[in-house]
A protein has these predicted regions:
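Register position in tetratricopeptide repeats
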Residues: 85, 119, 153-154, 186-188
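Alpha-helical adaptor scaffolds
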Residues: 70-136
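Canonical tetratricopeptide repeat
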Residues: 78, 112, 146, 180-181
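TPR/TPR-like (Sel1-like) alpha-helical repeat modules
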Residues: 46-47, 152-176
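N-terminal leader/linker segments that initiate helical-solenoid repeat arrays
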Residues: 22-78
Length: 196
């Protein structure tokens, strides 16, 4: 979904050191353009033969999505993700707010803040951030699936169904795919109906 990326310990050390730098200390550069390798990985995940293989490919996608525009932005992103993983949702929101204020054109800032909103069951705020993330990065599969889950949380089932279908076209191995299985809450209407 919108979520996780393991960062080695040395990145966390950099994050702690860089956290003392105010976000307004310099202007955020443009986010790196990883569209070419991401498109290649999307092709690979569509051809994956197992869930394990697909997960490995998805993890490589995360490395690109979570590649912030510079070291300062990376430190803020990593710090927020660490706080989120420790269930410090308010601290994570503060970090992602800071990241978005500093790098308003960086999609992952919105995606990560959306995840925190989602975990807090604030689906409307999650949806707003996911829509912005997708404006900036239209084929961000994790944001697409997060959007589907947020719409589902708002009981907007038809929109959730469409959002999940779009994400599954890019990665048919998403963990959320089971929601669209026959009998699932986001299954197409009539899927799984038994004729008598």
């Amino acid at each position: 979904m919108f979520f996780t990326l393991f960062r080695p310990p040395f990145v966390l050390a950099v994050a702690v050191t860089a956290s003392a730098i105010p976000a307004h200390a310099m202007e955020c550069p443009e986010a790196p353009d990883h569209s070419t390798p991401l498109e290649a990985l999307m092709g690979e995940v569509q051809d994956a033969e197992s869930e394990t293989q697909a997960r490995e490919i998805a993890n490589r996608m995360w490395e690109y999505w979570a590649d912030a525009p510079n070291a300062q932005a990376q430190a803020i992103l990593d710090r927020g993700m660490t706080k989120r993983s420790a269930f410090d949702f308010l601290g994570a929101l503060a970090d992602f707010d800071q990241l978005i204020a500093y790098c308003p054109e960086y999609a992952e800032g919105y995606n990560q803040r959306a995840f925190v909103h989602y975990l807090r069951r604030d689906f409307e705020s999650a949806l707003t951030d996911l829509d912005r993330a997708l404006e900036l990065s239209p084929r961000h599969i994790a944001a697409m699936s997060g959007r589907a889950l947020s719409l589902y949380g708002l009981s907007r089932l038809e929109e959730a169904r469409e959002a999940l279908a779009a994400a599954l076209k890019l990665n048919p191995w998403l963990p959320e795919r089971y929601l669209a299985d026959p009998g699932g809450p986001l299954a197409p209407p009539g899927a799984g109906d038994v004729e008598l």
